[in-house]
C-alpha cells in the first residue's frame, strides 16, 4: 500500500513500512538538513518542507498516513504547553486532520511522547480522540519502550493507530490488538557497542576522571559498611549541615536563628545580613518561593542525606574535599539501578543537571535532545586501531580510562537506523536527530499487526 511520511525526520516510519513492502509516495520535513538526508536516502520519494504550506490536494493519494508529530509541546523535557505551544507546534496535529479530511486514508499510524495521554489532565488526548473520531476513525493506543523487546534503550513512546470506518460504520479495528511484549526479555547495551568503532568518538574528558574516581570510592565505602546504596539522590551539600528547615524554610528565618548554624558542606553561616547568611545555604534552600510551607519530599531528602552523613562521618569528612573543586552538578549523585555490582565500569553513566547518575547496563536512557545527557559507556575499550577526537587529533589509551560517550553509530543502531547515510551531519546533529526519531523495529512490530501482509520487493 501507499503511505505518506509526515514530520519525517530521518525516515523511521519509511524504513519500517518499506520493510513490510509498502511504498512511500510523499514526505514532509521542515528541517532543511534532514530534508537533504531524506532525499539522499530515499531519492525516489518527493519530500516537501513546512506542512502548513502544503495543499492537501497536492499530496498524492495514499492508504496509510504516518506521522511522528512534534512532541516537545507535550514532553517532560519541553514546556508541556500542548495545543497552546507558543511556537505553534501543538496545532500541527490539526494539519494531520486537514490531510485526513481530504484524503481519507484507510490507516493512520501516529507516534508521540508517553506524557501525551496525561497532558493537561487528559484533556489534550481527549480532544485528539474526538477529532479523529469525527473524521471517521476508530483508534487504539499504547505505550511501548524499546527495552521491552530486547532493544537496549529505555524510551517510552505513545503509539496511536486507527482505521477508517466504512459506510456501515465498521472499521475492523476491533480485530486489532497491540503486541504483548515477551516475558523475561533481556537487553544489554554491550550488544550495540562496536569495540573498533573509531568514527568521531568523544572520550570522557580528563577533568571528569577524578570526579568519577571520587564517586567510585564513595560507593565502595558506603556499600562496604551498609551493604547497599541508598536509592535517594546524594546531596553532598547536606554533609555536615545543621541549619533548621522542618517548620520554616531557612530563607524566611530570622538572622538570629540562622547565625551560628552550619550550612552547605558543614560550613559555619556567617555574616551581618540575612543575604550573607542565606548565601551560605545549599542552593536549593536559597530560593524564596516557599513561605510557611516546605515540600515534604524535600524534607525527607534532607533527612536522608544527613542520616547518611552521620553513619559515615568518619570517612566522608576526609573524602568530601576531593569533590568540592568541581561544578555543583558533579557534587550530586544517584545510584539508579537495583544491580548490586558496585563497579561503575559495569554500568552506564549519565551527567545530568541533577547530578551524576549510574544506570543499569540493560539499557541506555532516552537519547535526548540535550547532548549533555548523552550516555557514557565506561566499559567501552580503546579501539585497537586508535581513534581521533572531533577535531581530528589522536586519542591516547589513557583518555579512555573512563570510557567514552555513546557513539553516533551506536545511537543509530539503537534506533535501528544504522543503514542510513548521514551525509555531513555533525555528531551533535546526528545524535539530536536520532533522539527525536521513532524506533524502526518497534514501529515495524506494530505495523505488522495493523496492516495487511505484503511481500517486500
Functional labels for PLM-detected ranges:
Residues 14, 72-76, 116-119, 150-154, ...:
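Short catalytic/ligand-binding loop motif for oxyanion handling, primarily in non-cytosolic enzymes
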Residues 48-49, 114, 136-148:
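Conserved S-adenosyl-L-methionine
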Residues 128-143, 164-168:
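A SAM-dependent methyltransferase catalytic signature shared across enzymes that methylate proteins
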Residues 2-110, 114-126, 130:
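Core alpha/beta nucleotide-donor-binding catalytic domains of modification enzymes
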Amino acid at each position: 500500500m501507499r503511505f505518506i511520511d509526515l514530520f519525517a525526520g530521518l525516515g523511521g516510519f519509511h524504513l519500517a513500512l518499506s520493510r513490510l513492502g509498502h511504498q512511500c509516495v510523499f514526505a514532509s520535513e521542515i528541517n532543511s538538513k534532514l530534508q537533504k538526508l531524506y532525499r539522499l536516502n530515499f531519492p525516489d520519494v518527493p519530500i516537501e518542507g513546512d506542512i502548513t504550506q502544503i495543499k492537501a490536494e497536492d499530496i498524492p493519494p495514499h492508504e496509510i498516513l504516518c506521522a511522528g508529530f512534534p512532541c516537545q509541546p507535550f514532553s517532560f523535557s519541553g514546556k508541556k504547553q500542548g495545543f497552546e505551544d507558543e511556537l505553534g507546534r501543538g496545532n500541527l496535529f490539526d494539519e494531520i486532520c486537514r490531510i485526513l479530511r481530504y484524503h481519507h486514508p484507510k490507516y493512520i499510524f501516529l507516534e508521540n511522547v508517553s506524557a501525551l495521554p496525561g497532558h493537561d489532565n487528559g484533556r489534550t488526548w481527549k480532544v485528539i480522540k474526538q477529532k479523529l473520531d469525527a473524521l471517521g476513525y476508530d483508534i487504539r493506543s499504547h505505550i511501548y519502550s524499546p527495552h521491552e523487546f530486547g532493544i537496549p534503550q529505555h524510551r517510552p513512546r505513545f503509539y496511536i493507530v486507527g482505521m477508517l470506518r466504512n459506510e456501515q460504520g465498521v472499521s475492523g479495528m476491533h480485530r486489532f490488538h497491540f503486541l504483548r511484549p515477551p516475558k523475561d526479555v533481556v537487553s544489554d547495551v554491550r550488544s550495540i557497542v562496536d569495540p573498533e568503532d573509531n568514527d568521531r568518538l568523544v572520550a570522557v574528558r580528563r577533568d571528569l576522571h577524578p570526579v568519577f574516581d571520587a564517586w567510585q570510592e564513595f560507593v565502595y565505602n558506603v556499600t562496604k559498611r551498609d551493604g547497599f546504596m541508598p536509592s535517594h539522590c546524594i546531596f553532598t551539600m547536606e554533609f555536615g549541615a545543621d541549619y533548621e528547615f522542618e517548620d520554616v524554610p531557612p530563607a524566611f528565618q530570622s538572622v538570629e536563628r540562622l547565625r551560628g548554624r552550619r550550612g552547605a558542606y558543614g560550613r559555619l553561616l556567617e555574616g551581618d545580613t540575612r543575604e550573607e547568611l542565606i548565601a551560605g545555604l545549599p542552593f536549593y534552600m536559597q530560593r524564596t518561593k516557599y513561605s510557611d510551607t516546605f515540600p515534604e519530599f524535600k524534607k525527607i531528602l534532607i533527612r536522608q542525606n544527613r542520616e547518611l552523613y552521620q553513619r559515615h562521618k568518619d570517612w566522608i569528612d576526609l573524602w568530601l574535599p576531593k569533590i568540592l573543586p568541581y561544578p555543583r552538578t558533579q557534587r550530586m549523585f544517584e545510584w539508579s539501578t537495583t544491580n548490586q555490582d558496585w563497579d561503575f565500569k559495569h554500568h552506564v553513566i549519565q551527567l545530568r543537571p541533577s547530578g551524576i547518575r549510574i544506570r543499569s547496563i540493560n539499557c541506555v536512557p532516552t537519547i535526548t535532545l540535550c547532548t549533555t545527557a548523552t550516555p557514557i559507556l565506561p566499559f567501552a575499550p580503546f579501539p585497537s586501531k586508535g581513534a581521533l577526537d572531533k577535531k581530528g587529533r589522536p586519542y591516547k589509551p589513557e583518555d579512555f580510562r573512563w570510557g567514552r560517550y555513546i557513539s553516533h553509530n551506536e545511537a543509530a543502531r539503537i534506533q535501528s537506523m544504522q543503514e542510513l547515510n548521514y551525509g555531513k551531519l555533525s555528531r551533535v546533529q546526528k545524535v539530536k536527530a536520532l533522539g527525536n526519531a521513532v524506533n524502526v523495529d518497534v514501529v515495524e512490530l506494530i505495523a505488522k499487526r495493523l496492516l495487511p501482509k505484503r511481500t517486500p520487493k
